[in-house]
Amino acid sequence: MKIKLLIIITAITLSQLVATDFTITRLKYGGGGDWYSDPSSLPNLLDFLQNETNIKTASKEIKASIGSSDFYNNSYYYITGHGKINFSNNEINILRDVLLNGAFLHADDNYGMDQSFREEMKKVFPEKDWVELPHDHEIF
């Protein structure tokens, strides 16, 4: 009986450690672009998800540099700004690895980031070309 109780308590404890609220990681980056711009965008998105879906969300975003310990606490990444992005070679390799393993990168050009973002992503995926998805693509 004591062993069964110990197993149940352990299972409940572990499930609580694993059961985390959905959140989004805002990527910090070098290059002069303002990675911190539009500070209300992610809280608003998380609030919308909480109120309009069955997804339990965290109240705050995570802010992390690529490769930092906080970076690995999530798989939904958000990048925004008004200027140049510059990833180091190490950041390029890490970003490639996480994206190839199922992570999602949400890019939001607040004006002026588009060209730089495309150039940096070409370094992440040099073998890939940008393609426009048709409106009837299954993702929509």
Predicted regions and their residues:
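Surface-exposed patches in mature extracellular/periplasmic domains of secreted proteins
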Residues: K56-A64, A107-N110, K128-H135
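Sec-exported extracytoplasmic/periplasmic mature domains
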Residues: Q50-N54, L100, K122-P126
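An acidic, glycine-rich "communication" segment
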Residues: F22, K28-G32, S40-S41, M113-F140
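Short alpha-beta junction capping motif
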Residues: I24, Y76-Q115
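Extracytoplasmic/secreted proteins, especially bacterial periplasmic and envelope-associated proteins
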Residues: S40-N44, F48, N90, I94, ...
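Sec-dependent N-terminal signal peptides
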Residues: I3-L14
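Intrinsically disordered, low-complexity boundary segments flanking structured domains
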Residues: I9-A11, A64-I66, E119
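Aromatic-Pro/Gly-enriched surface loop or interdomain linker
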Residues: L17-Y76, T80-G83
